[in-house]
Regions:
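Ubiquitin-like/PB1-type beta-grasp interaction modules and other compact soluble beta-rich domains
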Residues: 1-78
Length: 79
């Protein structure tokens, strides 16, 4: 599945998009675990990210399929 990254997540990985191999539908939490295995620099940021598929916000328990694109949104800060 494709995973789109923004902000500090993109900087930690060095790419705007990465692929995660899924054999079938899996909870978002498992996708995040796979990302940390491939990109350890993400681990400190993932507890605060919001997850979305399309226009729908998703929880970490929600299933995603290999054909979907998971979007990870870091918290926005500034003034």
């Amino acid at each position: 599945m494709k995973v789109e990254l923004f902000g500090v997540l993109r900087e930690a990985v060095g790419a705007a998009e990465v692929d995660v191999d899924l054999a079938g539908p899996a909870p978002i939490a498992e996708v995040l675990d796979a990302l940390v295995s491939d990109y350890p620099g993400l681990e400190e940021h993932l507890p605060r990210v919001a997850c979305a598929v399309g226009d729908d916000m998703r929880s970490r328990a929600d299933l995603v399929s290999p054909t979907e694109t998971l979007v990870l949104l870091p918290p926005v800060s500034g003034g």
